[in-house]
UniProtKB/Swiss-Prot annotation:
This is UPF0482 protein CKO_01577. Belongs to the UPF0482 family. Residues 1-28 form the signal peptide. It comes from the Bacteria. InterPro entries: DUF1283. Coiled coil: none annotated.
Length: 113
């Protein structure tokens, strides 16, 4: 019985000590207050560097967009030409998918549908 009582007292003491340590660690020393408007020299420099990088990559972005637009226009024109070739009154005209052209079956030359 004495052994059980000492275990309970030891456990209670450990829980109390743990609670004290936990509650004291939860309180932080907040004696300093820093208010920053976001307009520091470092943030201005960072914004200037980002703007410079954005401007430097502008021409590259324009080239990529132009290339994508050209590829789209080429595919769109090929689709239209295929439709015209398949609906052509010329019976010898056929669509060549590898070259994306309308060709004559007899000569192999390009046909205007």
């Amino acid at each position: 019985m004495n052994n059980t009582l000492s275990k309970r007292l030891c456990l209670t003491a450990m829980l109390a000590l743990g609670a004290v340590v936990y509650t004291t660690s939860a309180f932080a020393n907040t004696s300093k207050l820093i208010i920053e408007s976001g307009d520091s020299a470092q943030s201005r420099q960072h914004a200037a560097m980002e703007k410079e990088q954005w401007n430097d990559t502008r021409s590259l972005r324009q080239k990529v967009n132009t290339r994508t637009e050209k590829e789209w226009d080429k595919a769109d024109a090929a689709f239209d030409n295929r439709d015209k070739c398949e609906q052509s009154a010329n019976l010898n005209a056929y669509w060549e998918p590898n070259t994306l052209r309308c060709l004559d079956r007899r000569t192999g030359r390009t046909v205007a549908p």
